[in-house]
Swiss-Prot record:
Gene: ftsH
Family listed: In the central section; belongs to the AAA ATPase family. In the C-terminal section; belongs to the peptidase M41 family.
Chain segments annotated as transmembrane: 6-26, 120-140
UniProt KW Transmembrane keyword: yes
Family matches, as CDD domains: RecA-like_FtsH
Gene Ontology annotations of biological process type: protein catabolic process; proteolysis
Organism: Vaucheria litorea (Yellow-green alga)
Documented EC number(s): 3.4.24.-
Membrane topology (UniProt): Multi-pass membrane protein
This protein's name: ATP-dependent zinc metalloprotease FtsH
Function statement: Acts as a processive, ATP-dependent zinc metallopeptidase.
Principal location: plastid
A GO CC term assigned to this protein in UniProt: chloroplast thylakoid membrane
Length: 644
C-alpha cells in the first residue's frame, strides 16, 4: 500500500467522523432545548388533578414529550388566578383513553418527537470502536511496511548490540588493575600471543580460544578484560549475555553470528561476554525444562567458538559469578579452555587497590591506607572504590578540604551497617543494650582465639541498636576449631550478659541474629567440617541449589538416626559455649559494670581504649594469629574449650 493512498483513506475517515460529530452536536441541541422547556415550568400537577382540570374545561392545550410520558399543559383556573400558565404533568404509561378524552373535550394536543440520547451513544460506539481498530491496524501496517522497506532496519535488529572499541588504546592497562597479581600473570601469555603470535606458532603451540573469569561481583573481571585489550593494543568488543535473547525467535543465534563476524573483521581482537550465565546455563534441565530460544543461542555460541579457523587471533573472554550453572560443553577444552578465579582481595591486595583509587582523592597526611585495608576484610575492589567515594562525599558535606580517618571510619560503618540513627534516650533500654554489646566485646577480648575488638558503640545503625566491631589480625584460608568455638562463645556473650545482669525473665530479642549465626556455624561444624563426635565426615557435600539446572529437590543422604545425632551435637556445642560465656561474664562482672558506665557516657569506645581499660583490671591474653603460634600452644589448654 502506498503512503499517499493511506493518507487519502485517513482523510476520508476524518471527514466521516466530523460529519458524525456534527450530527451529534445538532442532536444535543435538540435535547437541550427540550430540557430547557421542561426546566422553565416550575409548576407541576398530579395526573388525577389533571383529569379534574380536563373535566372542568380548564385545559386549553397539551404538548406531549418523551413518547407521551410527559405533558406540558396550558391551563387557566381560579386557582391559577384565571391566568394561562404552563404546567408539567407526568402521564402513566399506556393511558390510551386520555387521547379520547382530549378529543371529546375538544382540547388541542400535539405529540413532539424526541431523540434518545442513549441510542445515539450506542450508535456512536458501534461506529467508533471499529474505526479505532481499523485506524490502529493501518498505523501498525505502515510501521511494519517502513520497518521492512527501510534501509537496513530489519537487518540491524538482528545484529548484535556489541560495543566495538577499535582504538588501540582502551585507557586501561594492567597498572590500573590492582590486588590480583597472580591473575595478571596468567594473562601475560595471552597479551604476548596477541602481540607476537609467531613465538607460539613456531613451536606448534595453540593459544586458548577462550578464558572464563570466575569471581564474586565487583572483583574486577570486566576491568581485567579491558586491561588485556589495552596491553595487547587490539580492538575490544564487549556485549552482555542478556543482550542476545529477546522476544523474537532466532534473534539470539543471529546476533551471535553477527558478533563473531564483527570479531573476524577486527581480528586480532578480544571478545568480552559479560554475565555469560544469562545464555550459558545448562540445557534441558531444572523445573520447567529448557528454554528453546536460550538453548539455540547457546548452541550457536558453541558452534562459533569450535568453528574458528586455527590461530585467527580472536580470544573470547567471559565473566560470570555462577560457573556452577554453566553448560559442560561450554567449559570443555577448545572453547573456554581456562577458568581463572578472581577472589576477593587479601589485605595486601586491598592496600594496592586503595592506592589506585586514592590517586585522584585528596587525603589528609595522617590517613593510613594500611589501616583501612585492615578494617575492610571481605571488601571487593568495587567496594573499596565506593568506600573512598563515600568518604570524599562526606568530606565535602562537612566542608573539609581533605579526607581524614574520621570520614573513612564513618563510611565503613555506613557501608557495613547502614545509616546512622538517633541515639537512644531511654535509660533502661540504653543500659540493657550497653550490657549486651559489652558482653560481646569483653568475651572477644579475653578469648585468645577470638579476633580483637575494633570499636564498641551505642549509636544505632540500620536495624541494629548497638554494634561491636571485631577486626582480624590476619586473613587465613584455614580456620581452626578453636577459632570457630571462640566466635560462637563471643557471639553468645550478649545474651549471656543479659541473663546474668537482668535475669532470665529480662532477656530480649536483641540476640535473635546472634542465635541464627551461631546455629548455622555450629551445624556446619558438625555436617561439613567434621568437628564433632559425629566424626570426620561431610553430610551435605552433594546438596545443590534448586532451580538452576541441576536438580529439582535436595535429598538427605543420611538416616533419621544420624539426623537426630546431628541435632544433638549442635545442641551440645551451643550449650557448652553458652555456659562458657556465662562463666566469663560472672567472673568479670565488676569490670563489665565499669565498662558499661563508660560506654553509656561516651557512646563509643575504640578498640585501643577498650583493651587499655580491661588491662587495668585483668591481664590480657596473647592473641594467637598465626599457625606457628597455634602449634606452640599447650594442647591441654586448647582442649579445655574445644572438645565436646
Amino acid at each position: 500500500m502506498k503512503s499517499w493512498s493511506v493518507n487519502k483513506i485517513i482523510m476520508l475517515i476524518s471527514l466521516f467522523l466530523l460529519e458524525v460529530i456534527d450530527s451529534q452536536i445538532i442532536s444535543n441541541n435538540i435535547i437541550n432545548n427540550f430540557n430547557t422547556k421542561q426546566n422553565s415550568n416550575n409548576i407541576k400537577m398530579t395526573y388525577g388533578r389533571f383529569l379534574e382540570y380536563l373535566d372542568m374545561g380548564w385545559i386549553k392545550k397539551v404538548d406531549f414529550y418523551d413518547n407521551g410520558r410527559i405533558a406540558i399543559i396550558e391551563a387557566s383556573s381560579p386557582e391559577l388566578g384565571d391566568r394561562l400558565q404552563k404546567i408539567r404533568v407526568e402521564i402513566p404509561v399506556g393511558d390510551s383513553p386520555l387521547i379520547v378524552k382530549l378529543r371529546t373535550a375538544k382540547v388541542d394536543f400535539t405529540a413532539h418527537s424526541t431523540i434518545n440520547s442513549k441510542g445515539i451513544f450506542t450508535q456512536l460506539s458501534n461506529i467508533f470502536i471499529p474505526l479505532i481498530i481499523i485506524i490502529g491496524l493501518i498505523f501498525l501496517f505502515r510501521r511494519s511496511t517502513n520497518f521492512m522497506s527501510g534501509p537496513g532496519q530489519l537487518m540491524s535488529f538482528r545484529k548484535a548490540r556489541a560495543k566495538v572499541q577499535t582504538e588501540i588504546n582502551t585507557d586501561v592497562v594492567f597498572d590500573d588493575v590492582a590486588g590480583i597479581d597472580e591473575v595478571k600473570e596468567e594473562f601475560e601469555e595471552v597479551v604476548t600471543f596477541l602481540r607476537k603470535p609467531q613465538r607460539f606458532l613456531s613451536v606448534g603451540a595453540k593459544i586458548p580460544k577462550g578464558v572464563i573469569l570466575i569471581g564474586p561481583p565487583g572483583t574486577g573481571k570486566t576491568l581485567l578484560a579491558k586491561a588485556i585489550a589495552g596491553e595487547a593494543g587490539v580492538p575490544f568488543i564487549s556485549i552482555s549475555g542478556s543482550e542476545f535473547v529477546e522476544m523474537f525467535v532466532g534473534i539470539g543465534a543471529s546476533r551471535v553470528r553477527d558478533l563473531f563476524k564483527t570479531a573476524q573483521q577486527n581480528a586480532p581482537c578480544i571478545v568480552f561476554i559479560d554475565e555469560i550465565d544469562a545464555v550459558g546455563r545448562q540445557r534441558g534441565a531444572g523445573i520447567g525444562g529448557g528454554n528453546d530460544e536460550r538453548e539455540q543461542t547457546l548452541n550457536q555460541i558453541l558452534t562459533e567458538m569450535d568453528g574458528f579457523k586455527e590461530n585467527t587471533g580472536i580470544i573470547v573472554i567471559a565473566a560470570t559469578n555462577r560457573v556452577d550453572v554453566l553448560d559442560g560443553a561450554l567449559l570443555r577444552p577448545g572453547r573456554f579452555d581456562r577458568q581463572v578465579s578472581i577472589n576477593l582481595p587479601d589485605i595486601k591486595g586491598r592496600l594496592e587497590i586503595l592506592k589506585v583509587h586514592a590517586k585522584n582523592k585528596k587525603l589528609d597526611s595522617n590517613i593510613s591506607l594500611g589501616l583501612i585495608a585492615q578494617r575492610t576484610p571481605g571488601f571487593s575492589g568495587a567496594d573499596l572504590a565506593n568506600l573512598l567515594n563515600e568518604s570524599a562525599i562526606l568530606t565535602a558535606r562537612r566542608n573539609k578540604f581533605a579526607i581524614t580517618m574520621s570520614e573513612v571510619n564513618t563510611a565503613i560503618d555506613r557501608l557495613l551497617a547502614g545509616l546512622e540513627g538517633t541515639s537512644l534516650t531511654d535509660t533502661k533500654n540504653k543500659r540493657l543494650i550497653a550490657y549486651h554489646e559489652i558482653g560481646h566485646a569483653v568475651i572477644g577480648t579475653l578469648l585468645k582465639y577470638h579476633d580483637e575488638v575494633q570499636k564498641v558503640t551505642l549509636i544505632p545503625r540500620g536495624q541494629a541498636r548497638g554494634l561491636t566491631w571485631f577486626i582480624p589480625n590476619d586473613e587465613q584460608a584455614l580456620i581452626s576449631r578453636g577459632q570457630l568455638v571462640a566466635r560462637i562463645i563471643g557471639t553468645l556473650g550478649g545474651r549471656a550478659a543479659e541473663e546474668v545482669v537482668f535475669g532470665s525473665s529480662e532477656i530480649t530479642t536483641g540476640a535473635s541474629n546472634d542465635l541464627q549465626q551461631i546455629t548455622n556455624l555450629t551445624r556446619q561444624m558438625v555436617t561439613r567440617l567434621g568437628m564433632s563426635t559425629v566424626g570426620p565426615i561431610s553430610l551435605d557435600a552433594n546438596v545443590e541449589q534448586v532451580f538452576i539446572g541441576r536438580g529439582i529437590k535436595n535429598n538427605n543422604e543420611f538416616s533419621a538416626s544420624v539426623a537426630n545425632k546431628i541435632d544433638d551435637q549442635v545442641k551440645i556445642i551451643i550449650k557448652h559455649c553458652y555456659d562458657q560465656a556465662v562463666n566469663i561474664i560472672k567472673q568479670n562482672r565488676f569490670l563489665i559494670d565499669q565498662l558499661v558506665n563508660t560506654l553509656i557516657q561516651e557512646e563509643t569506645i575504640s578498640g585501643n581504649d577498650f583493651r587499655e581499660q580491661i588491662n587495668n583490671y585483668t591481664k590480657l591474653p596473647k592473641k594467637l594469629s598465626t599457625l606457628s603460634e597455634k602449634n606452640n600452644v599447650n594442647p591441654k589448654i586448647t582442649e579445655s574449650f574445644v572438645v565436646f
